Amino acid sequence: MKTLKQLIFFTAIALFSVSSCQSGNTNKNEVNTAGIGNKIQGDTLILIETPYGNMKIKLYDQTPKHKANFIKLAKEGYYNGLLFHRVINQFMIQGGDPDSKNAPAGKMLGNGGPAYEIDAEFNDSLFHKKGVIAAAREGDDVNPQKKSSGSQFYIVQGRTFTDEELDKLEEKSSVGNYIASHPEINKEAANYRMTGNKPAFNKLIENIKKKGDFKIAKIPDYKRTIYKTIGGTPHLDNNYTVFGELIEGLDVIDKIAALKTDKNDRPIENVKMTIKVIVE
């Protein structure tokens, strides 16, 4: 069963899920290409305490709605005692569901949150390198505006990619975006998916690649460098709002992501969090 706020895996057969890799006109100097962030005077810093160590996060000024909301919830103690309820090795660790507080073992989580969502705040200079924090959300089928959950978030672990893998991702993402932006083609693709007609779907993909208005959106070189060295989850770029990054505690992500989980990706051993604002 698909839960609300559940992050989407992108596979070859799910090309009609939007996953943009457009380069835009980003200034490289705006991006920290070293991977893990550095504190700059005036940054808002958040501390996430866990049984496996602490993570210190700086929140981005470029995403003011998400920044203000996270600060508000942290100050209210909203996150204290909640779980990292969904962890997937080489992908991410997810938390912030209020239903996870004192949840019995085995309970499926991921549907909880405050009674509001946050408008997406995409910024091409903020992308899914290892160590960023981003907002979870409902899927595109019920949330085409990609609004964020009011409380649920995930921290990226990801993995490193080769140039060949990134080339394939560019093509898949570009095809997915093309399908999503053409309603009739989107409807046709959805029909093939529902009926399991893989040959027809594959033929549709090949025809799209031959269209004169189809272009592959390239991943900029500075992002490629990070995805090849530091790692991350490039297929999520411009689909989920990235609103901060770790400046300490990358090893904590790895420890939590490596835990044994149940069939719903919930750690067998509860991983509770405490979140506080330490510099504002």
Predicted regions located by residue number:
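Bacterial Sec-dependent N-terminal signal peptides
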Residues: 1-31
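Cyclophilin-like peptidyl-prolyl cis-trans isomerases
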Residues: 21-280
